[in-house]
Amino acid sequence: MVLSNVKIFRLKSHRAFRIGPMIKAVAGNLLVKRFYQPKLERIPPASLLLKQKIRLAQNGSTTSTENPISFSQTMSEIFSVLQPSAPDLDEDETSGLKRDHLLTERLNNGELGVIMNKFFNPSSTHNNQLIDTNILLQNFPKLSGNDLDLLDFAINEKMRGNWNDLKQDFIQLWYYKSFGFLGPRTQFVLTNSSPSVRSQFLKLPFIEYNWFLLQNNKNANILPADVQNVVKVFHLDDKRFTWKSIDPFSKAIISFVVFVSIYVWLDESAKQKTKELPAQKSTVISE
C-alpha cells in the first residue's frame, strides 16, 4: 500500500510538473492578445469597401421585408401610391454604389490616363508638364459624358490625398473643369480683346459675363439686350401661403395623409400596450 501511494503521488506530481508550464504559456498568450493589438497599416481597397456597401444595401432591402411594418415604411408605401413616378430610395442608393464601384474600377485600370493621352498632347502628359492652352480649349468640349463622369470622380478621389503627388496636367484639367479657362479671377479679358477670345468667353456663365462687361471698362456702352442677359429681376408676391389658398385636391391628399398617420400611430401605441401587459403580469407573478 505504501509503495502504491508513493507511485500515485509521483505520477500526480509529474503531471502537475508538465501541466504547469502549459498553463503559464496559455495564460501568457491570452494576456498578449488582450493587451497587445497590432496596428494594421494596410487600408482595404476602395473597390472592396464599395462591394461591401452594395452587399449590405441589398441584404438590408431583403431583410426589411421580414421585419414588422414600421411607421416610416407605412408612410413610404402611402407616398409611393400617391406618387407612383417617385424614385425608390433603396434602388437609388444601390445604383449609386454600383456606379461608384464601376468608376473606381475604371480609375484603377488607368482609363483616365488613356483619355488624357488621347485628347491632350501625350508628350506633355508624360513629361509632367502643362497642357497646351489651344489643345485644352479645342479638345475639352469633345469629352463625352462618361469621360466627364470619370474626371469628376477622379477629382473627388484624388483631392483627399496629398496634392503634391498630383501631376501638373491633372491639376490644370481640374482647374479648367472647375473654373473655366479664365479661372476664379476678379479681372478677366479686356473689352477690346480679339473676337475669338470674346466668343469663347461669352460661353461662360452669366455672372462672369457680368464681370466681363463691368469690371475692366466701366465706361463701356452696354446694350439693353446685354443687361437683360446679365441681370435677372424677381418680383416678390404679396400673397401668402394659407390653407384657403390650397386647391381642393391638395387638401384631400393632406387630410388623407394626416388621417393615416394618426391611425398608424394609434395602432402602434395599442400594440405597444398589449406587449407591456404580459411583461407586467410576469413580473408580478415572479414576485
From Swiss-Prot:
Q: Where along the chain is the transit peptide annotated?
A: 1-24
Q: Does the keyword tRNA-binding apply?
A: no
Q: Keywords for this entry?
A: Membrane, Mitochondrion, Transit peptide, Transmembrane, Transmembrane helix
Segments traversing the membrane: 250-266
Q: Where in the cell is it found?
A: Mitochondrion membrane
Q: What are the annotated GO cellular component locations?
A: mitochondrial membrane; mitochondrion
Q: What is its main location?
A: mitochondrion
Tell me the membrane topology, using the record's own terms: Single-pass membrane protein
Function, please? Involved in respiratory growth and required for cell survival in the absence of prohibitins or GEM1.
Family, as annotated: Belongs to the GEP7 family.
Recorded protein name is: Genetic interactor of prohibitin 7, mitochondrial
Annotated source species: Saccharomyces cerevisiae (strain ATCC 204508 / S288c) (Baker's yeast)
